[in-house]
C-alpha cells in the first residue's frame, strides 16, 4: 500500500489561531483530517507530524522515510535556513 509522510515545520501548529485573515481559519488538525480522509479514499496511508524544532523534524524523517512511498514537506520557517532538514531530505531517497 502507498504511504505518505506529511511533515509540517515551525508555527504551522498555529494555523486557525494566528492571523486568520492571512493564514485562514482551518487548524492544522482540520487540514490533517482532510488530507487523511482524501488519502484513505485513494487507498493511501498517511502519517502526519509537526514540530517547531528542526531536530525533531529530522529525527522523524530519518525514522520513517524508509517505510514511506513519498514525503510531503512544508518546512515553513525553515525554508530559508533549514540546511539540516534539507540534508535529511536528500538522504531519504
Predicted regions mapped to residue ranges:
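Extreme N-terminal starter segment of soluble prokaryotic enzymes
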Residues: 1-5
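Active-site donor-nucleotide binding/catalytic segment of nucleotide-sugar enzymes
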Residues: 12
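Glycine- and acidic-residue-enriched helix-capping/strand-helix junction motifs
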Residues: 15-29
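Loop-to-helix element that buttresses phosphate recognition and phosphoryl-transfer chemistry
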Residues: 27-41
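Basic phosphate/pyrophosphate-binding loop/patch that engages nucleotide-derived ligands
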Residues: 93
Amino acid at each position: 500500500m502507498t504511504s505518505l509522510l506529511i511533515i509540517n515545520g515551525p508555527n504551522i501548529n498555529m494555523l486557525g489561531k494566528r492571523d486568520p485573515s492571512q493564514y485562514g481559519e482551518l487548524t492544522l488538525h482540520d487540514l490533517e483530517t482532510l488530507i487523511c480522509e482524501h488519502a484513505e479514499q485513494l487507498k493511501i496511508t498517511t502519517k502526519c507530524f509537526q514540530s517547531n524544532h528542526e531536530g525533531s523534524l529530522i529525527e522523524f524523517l530519518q525514522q520513517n522515510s524508509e517505510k514511506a512511498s513519498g514525503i510531503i514537506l512544508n518546512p515553513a520557517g525553515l525554508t530559508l535556513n533549514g540546511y539540516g532538514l534539507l540534508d535529511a531530505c536528500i538522504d531519504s531517497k
